[in-house]
Amino acid sequence: KVHFPISRIDVMDGSRRSSKSNAYFSGLGKNKRIALFDTLIEKHSVDELLSIIAHEVGHYKKRHNIKGIVLGVVQTGIMFFLLSIFLNNTGLFAAFKMENLSIYASLLFFSVLYSPIELIMSFVGNAISRKHEFEADAFAKKSIETGEHLINGLKNLTVTNLGNLTPHPLTVWMSYSHPPVLDRIHALFD
């Protein structure tokens, strides 16, 4: 129904390492695949699993993997550009009253001064990731023609993974790559 060319759906033996459940989409070109943890399959109904798979297909259809790669390349490019500015920068050494240039000192300066930039980029990356999750949820709802099964699946995932239903908004903004489940459920009701 959603025209998703996939070579296989893998079942990951996650129960050996954890009781948590998960599913993910990965791959490019002809090597696309969806992986479902065995714990996910054990604890969810067929309808919930179909909606979770539709959510993962949504990531593909909305090109979230490509956008993630582009974002990663841009972030890495920014890091290397800034690193090139810091390496053996005579003005930086003069500001710290250092007479001799040192690659080690340059790397130390860079790591200290780059940290706030990296923090800001992580906030941006998390915000984009949360937006992608809402988009994949909406795709699943449209594909399955109901959000009910995905809502039930999200509830089960939260119970299984001991998720926090009401995290502080600042915590979400700073560190969550996925929106809180209650926000996702509210969005699916709209």
Task: Give the location of each predicted region.
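Polar-ligand-bearing catalytic/cofactor-coordination segments
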Residues: 1-101, 115-116, 120-190
